[in-house]
A protein has these predicted regions:
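A short structural micro-motif
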Residues: 102-103, 177
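A cross-family structural signal marking well-folded subdomains
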Residues: 160-179
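Amphipathic alpha-helical repeat scaffolds of TPR domains
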Residues: 89-102
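A non-transmembrane, solvent-exposed segment enriched in polar/low-complexity residues
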Residues: 1-87, 106-130, 134-154
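Phospho-regulatory, Ser/Thr- and acidic-rich intrinsically disordered linkers and terminal tails
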Residues: 153, 157-161
């Protein structure tokens, strides 16, 4: 399949000045990158606001910030879902799906109120769920991602934050990924 397209940009600010012709998938990727920059700025602003809030330890304040973060996450997931629907089975869909982290259920609804160390149990269940589903959106048979910096970043994050640093745990996690 022959495709002709052109790319023009300012090398000092590629993302904001890139012009693409003849490649809807590349145009969608550029738009995705711009959207993610905006979303990351929005999330950082919420995080900064939370960090400076003198009432951040109050439960209702935490819930309000959590709702804002969840809304930002929903916007990203909706954007990616729309893009994947428009470009199914493409490198763009593979890449965009790879950026997603697992949607963790609200375990506070399933852990009984009278559970000893309830908050710890909720976090424990969330951790194990997240670890189990960390690679759900990853197709290891597709070599496209292996050549991207985001793959190394996600792999490093997995072994740094999801796997206990113990030879047996490291071994089992490596086997799970490779299989």
């Amino acid at each position: 399949d022959t495709q002709n397209f052109s790319i023009k940009s300012d090398t000092l600010d590629v993302l904001n000045h890139i012009e693409l012709e003849g490649s809807p998938e590349n145009t969608a990727f550029r738009d995705f990158q711009r959207f993610m920059v905006t979303q990351n700025q929005k999330s950082k602003a919420i995080r900064d606001e939370y960090d400076k809030d003198p009432n951040k330890d109050k439960e209702e304040i935490k819930k309000a910030y959590t709702a804002r973060f969840e809304q930002a996450d929903k916007e990203v997931r909706a954007y990616i879902a729309q893009m994947v629907k428009k470009f199914p089975h493409s490198a763009l869909a593979t890449f965009a799906n790879f950026t997603l982290s697992p949607e963790i259920p609200d375990f506070s609804k399933t852990v009984p109120e009278n559970t000893k160390d309830r908050e710890m149990e909720i976090r424990r269940q969330a951790y194990f769920y997240s670890k189990k589903h960390y690679w759900d959106y990853t197709n290891f048979a597709d070599s496209t991602l292996i050549r991207t910096p985001i793959f190394k970043t996600k792999l490093d994050d997995y072994f740094k934050n999801m796997v206990m640093v113990h030879p047996d745990s490291l071994y089992l996690s490596c086997v799970e990924i490779l299989e």
